[in-house]
Design a protein with these regions (language model features):
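Short, glycine-/small- and polar/acidic-enriched structural segments
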Residues: 40, 45, 52-232, 236, ...
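C-terminal motif of bacterial Sec signal peptides marking the signal peptidase cleavage site
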Residues: 20-24
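Conserved C-terminal helix/tail region of periplasmic/extracytoplasmic solute-binding proteins
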Residues: 55-58, 352-399
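Surface-exposed patches in mature extracellular/periplasmic domains of secreted proteins
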Residues: 116-117, 155-157, 214, 256, ...
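Bacterial N-terminal signal peptides that target proteins for export
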Residues: 1-11
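Secondary-structure end/capping motifs
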Residues: 279-368
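Pocket-lining segment of extracytoplasmic ligand-binding domains
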Residues: 222-223, 227-319
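Bacterial lipoprotein signal-peptidase II cleavage site
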Residues: 25-35
Length: 399
C-alpha cells in the first residue's frame, strides 16, 4: 500500500531556519540565526497544505495565488543552483524536464537562479557530494546508492521518473547466444557497468572481475563501439543505442534485465543533504518547476524533444546527437515514465517500497558487497509530496 504522507527524518531541522526567515521578512524582531524552538508543529496549524513538512504554512504555495514574497526571498538566498545533466542535453528523463522547465521560465517564476550544465552521470557524483553543484541526473537509483558509498556522500533522490530499468546489454550479433557466453569475455563500459546489467549477469552467476572483465570505451557512438574487436558488447539505454543500431541496419542481440526479473529505475533527480537542509524551499521549488516541465514533456513529446535539440545545437552538440535520435529517445522514455503515473503516484514521485526492493534484490545477488543498503536517508518522497495536489497535478502559483 502506497503512503504518500511520509515522515521527514531528513528535514526536521530545517523548519527552524525557514521560520526565522519568515519572521525576518515580515518585520518581526526575530532574525535569521535568532533563538527559535527546536521544532515547528505545522501539523496542527489550520491551512497547512502539507501537514508535517519542513516548510511553515506561511511559505506554502497555493495553486492560483501569488507566490509568497518571503518564499521568493528564501529562494533568492540560495544563490545560483547548478544542475548537471547526465548525458549532455539529450532528450532523456531527468534532463528533458529541466530543459523544458527552463525554456518556459518556470524557474524564474519561482525566484530561482538555475545554471544548467551538460555533463555525464558518473562524473557528477563527487561534485554533488561536495555541493559544488546542487542537482544532477542519475542513471538509476541503484547507481546513485552505489556512488553514495564510494564517495561517502549524502545524496538524496527527490524524483525517480522511470519505475523500470532503462539499461540493457547490447551484444554483437552471433557472439553471445546466451548470457552464459559472456563468461571469459570483455564488456565495454562508459565509466562503470550499469547496475541492472550487472545484476542480470550476477543472477546468472557471472561476477565482474572474476567471470568477465569491463573495459572503458571512448565516446558515446554505438556504431563505433559495436566494431571494437576486444569486446563482445556494451550496456546502453533501450531508448538510445539500440535505436541507432537499428537505424544503421547493424544487427545485434539485446539482453533486457527486466526479462530476467531484475527490477530497476531511471531518470533520477538528486541533490545533497547540505543543500536540502540549508535551502528547503529552493530545493522543493526546483523540483516543482521541473515536475511541471516533465508534465509538459510527457503531454507533447515531440515538442519537448525539439527543445532538447535546440539546446544541444546552441551548445555545440559535442556528442553529435541527431534530431531523429532524440525524438525517438523521448518517444520511448516518455511512455515508460507516464504509463506508471497515477494520482497517488504522480510523475517522478519516488516509491520507497519499490526502491527498497530494487537495492535489496541487487544486494542478494552480490551488488553492494552483498549487504542491502539502508536507503532511508537517500530518498525523500516528501519533497514531491508537497509539490502535487490530490489529483497528481503540480501546485503552481498565479502567473
Amino acid at each position: 500500500m502506497l503512503c504518500r504522507r511520509a515522515t521527514l527524518p531528513l528535514l526536521a531541522v530545517v523548519a527552524v531556519g525557514a521560520a526565522a526567515l519568515v519572521a525576518s521578512c515580515s518585520g518581526d524582531d526575530t532574525t535569521i540565526g535568532s533563538p527559535a524552538p527546536s521544532t515547528v508543529d505545522t501539523g496542527s496549524i489550520p491551512g497547512d497544505s502539507v501537514p508535517g513538512d519542513s516548510v511553515p504554512p506561511v511559505l506554502d504555495v497555493t495553486a492560483g495565488e501569488a507566490f509568497p514574497a518571503a518564499r521568493c526571498e528564501a529562494n533568492r538566498t540560495a544563490g545560483t543552483i547548478t544542475y548537471l545533466s547526465s548525458y549532455d542535453f539529450a532528450a532523456s528523463a531527468s534532463i528533458i524536464d529541466v530543459l523544458v522547465a527552463d525554456s518556459k521560465g518556470y524557474y524564474d517564476a519561482l525566484c530561482l537562479d538555475v545554471n544548467i550544465t551538460p555533463s555525464f552521470s558518473t562524473e557528477n557524483y563527487p561534485l554533488i557530494a561536495a555541493n559544488d553543484a546542487q542537482f544532477s541526473s542519475g542513471g538509476s537509483f541503484s547507481e546513485m546508492v552505489d556512488f553514495a558509498g564510494a564517495n561517502d556522500a549524502g545524496f538524496v533522490a527527490l524524483a525517480v521518473e522511470g519505475r523500470t530499468g532503462i539499461d540493457a546489454l547490447i551484444t554483437k550479433d552471433g557472439e553471445v547466444p546466451t548470457l552464459a557466453d559472456v563468461k571469459g569475455k570483455k564488456i565495454g563500459v562508459k565509466g562503470a557497468i550499469t547496475p541492472s546489467v550487472k545484476a542480470m549477469l550476477a543472477k546468472e552467476g557471472l561476477v565482474e572481475g572474476i567471470d568477465y572483465e569491463t573495459v572503458n570505451v571512448e565516446g558515446f557512438d554505438p556504431l563505433a563501439h559495436i566494431e571494437i574487436p576486444d569486446i563482445i558488447g556494451f550496456p546502453g539505454f533501450k531508448s538510445n543505442e539500440p535505436k541507432q543500431l537499428e537505424a544503421a541496419g547493424i544487427p545485434f542481440k539485446l539482453y533486457d534485465p527486466s526479462d530476467f526479473g531484475i527490477p530497476g529505475s531511471f531518470g533520477v533527480l538528486y541533490t545533497n543533504l547540505t543543500f536540502l537542509a540549508e535551502h528547503p524551499t529552493a530545493a522543493q521549488d526546483f523540483m516543482r518547476a521541473t515536475m511541471r516541465g516533465l508534465a509538459d514533456a510527457v503531454a507533447d513529446p515531440a515538442a519537448a524533444a525539439q527543445v532538447a535539440v535546440d539546446v544541444l545545437n546552441a551548445s555545440g552538440n559535442a556528442l553529435f546527437l541527431s534530431p531523429e535520435g532524440e525524438t525517438a529517445r523521448w518517444a520511448v522514455e516518455s511512455k515508460l515514465v507516464s504509463e506508471t503515473a497515477t494520482p497517488d503516484a504522480p510523475l517522478g514521485l519516488p516509491l520507497v517500497d519499490d526502491l527498497t526492493i530494487e537495492v535489496t534484490e541487487y544486494a542478494e545477488i552480490g551488488l553492494f558487497e552483498g549487504v542491502p543498503p539502508l536507503i532511508e536517508t537517500m530518498v525523500d518522497a516528501s519533497v514531491l509530496d508537497g509539490v502535487y495536489d490530490d489529483t497528481g497535478t503540480v501546485i503552481w502559483p498565479a502567473d
